[in-house]
């Protein structure tokens, strides 16, 4: 997958949070300006839009040459290709359809692309992060195997997702692709999976296991420290909170990879606790179904490997390569019979991956228009 490490074009981008907006500019997959931060004023549309225009104006003035595009992640629901933002829970001033993209195109006279953060995270990791990292290791190991497809998830306030397939971002016909958070919770069949894979899920399970009110539960970073013995608290409850997150996430991700058949990369604030949940996540992905006749079979035909585990990484890279004879000929060819998928952590960091994804998405769109 071609990257843009040496591209001289500049793209302005935005990290849109519920309380603040952070603006910057990218060139060659790197930030070239200081970050400009403004309040979101999400309950006042005029102020909110004014802050967005003002932030991009300030960044434009900091750029060494005129930007060629604006590209950023913004919450949904939205018609992202049209640049129209729908009714947002965290920015209540957005109601009835706000044509943010067309407004910015008119103001700055450059193309504007908007996507959700989970999709741009996956795209950034596919362009310059986890996907080329793993393929580089496979090449160095002399393996025949290469991956083209990547499923990215972010674990934090929610459970976000994105799919990069063969160098392209899968966005869907309604801007609703990769909505992993809407799949079913493994243990609560009337509940979506995000209630088991999020900050609130970690706190809720800790409260249940420790027998205390949720209001008295610390944040997940402290729960992580309790689990590894760095901070006093109910260690059993802390370990179970992260283990269960891994099991629930692994169930959802196994369903996704049954369709995608590629690598999976994990980002977001909760990914820092990977040592506590990744083993359970991988175990769930490698679990089996039971047929009506009592026989078991793998839920994924291809084994899933924890690529943060050196021993599993070694097996993953080695594969099972042997020489086979072409029927009717004396010629032999190499064959790697180990079908496999791998799961690992972001190599860029979540925010950086989103920014690189936004940069690459804008430039690919510009390049496509030239053809």
What residue spans do the PLM features occupy?
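ATP-binding/phosphotransfer module of carbohydrate and carboxylate kinases, centering on a glycine-rich
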Residues: 1-68, 80-82, 106-110, 139-142, ...
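Phosphate-binding/catalytic loop of phosphoryl-transfer enzymes
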Residues: 69-71, 77-192, 196, 200, ...
